[in-house]
C-alpha cells in the first residue's frame, strides 16, 4: 500500500516496509521508524512516516525516552533513540537506529544473504527519488539487528520552483516594443 503526503512543493510517498528477515512484520518496522523520530518533529519525512502509519491503522506501541534522540552526524549517518513499550511499566528500554541503509548494514554486520534479499526487494522500486529508511534495533545483551527498510520516494514539484525562480529573476529590459524600435 502506498501512502502519499504533500507538504508544500514536496510530495512524499511511503510504501510498505521490506523486512530484512521473514520474522519481522512490515507494520512493526514502520511503527519503529515512526517512534524513532524526534518528539514534535515537523520534518516532512517524519510527518510522511507518521501519516503512513495512521493511514494503515498501525498503533504506536512504543514511547521515546525524554531527550534520548540523537541526530545523525558525519561519523554516524543515522539517528538513534531509546524506546520503551508504552503499555508496560516494567518493560526494558532498547535503542533504535534509523537512517542510511549502508551504514546500518555495516553497524549490524548484515550477512550477504540478507543484503541480497534486500537488493532483490529494491529492484521493483524506481531509482528516481527513492530513499530507503532503514531501521535497526539494539536490545541489552544482544547485537544490533537490522529489521528492514521503509521505502520512501521524495519528489519536488520543480515546475513551480522553476517558475517562481524565473518570476523572481526576470526583469523586462529587452521587451517587444524595444525590439521593434531597434529593428
Identify the role of each PLM range.
Residues 149:
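Short glycine-/small-residue motifs
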Amino acid at each position: 500500500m502506498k501512502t502519499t503526503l504533500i507538504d508544500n512543493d514536496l510530495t512524499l510517498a511511503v510504501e510498505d516496509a521490506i523486512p530484512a528477515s521473514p520474522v519481522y512484520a512490515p507494520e512493526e518496522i514502520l511503527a519503529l521508524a515512526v517512534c524513532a523520530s524526534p518528539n514534535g518533529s515537523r520534518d516532512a519525512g517524519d510527518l510522511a512516516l507518521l501519516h503512513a502509519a495512521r493511514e494503515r491503522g498501525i498503533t504506536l506501541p512504543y514511547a521515546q525516552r525524554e531527550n534520548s534522540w540523537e541526530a545523525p552526524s558525519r561519523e554516524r549517518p543515522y539517528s538513534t533513540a531509546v524506546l520503551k513499550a508504552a503499555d508496560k511499566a516494567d518493560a526494558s528500554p532498547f535503542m533504535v537506529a534509523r537512517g542510511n541503509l549502508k551504514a546500518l548494514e555495516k553497524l549490524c554486520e548484515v550477512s550477504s544473504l540478507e543484503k541480497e534479499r534486500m537488493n532483490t526487494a529494491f529492484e521493483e522500486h524506481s531509482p528516481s527519488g527513492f530513499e530507503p529508511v532503514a531501521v535497526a534495533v539494539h536490545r541489552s545483551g544482544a547485537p544490533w539487528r537490522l529489521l528492514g527498510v521503509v521505502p520512501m520516494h521524495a519528489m519536488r514539484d520543480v515546475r513551480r520552483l522553476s517558475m517562481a525562480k524565473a518570476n523572481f529573476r526576470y526583469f523586462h529590459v529587452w521587451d517587444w516594443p524595444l525590439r521593434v524600435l531597434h529593428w
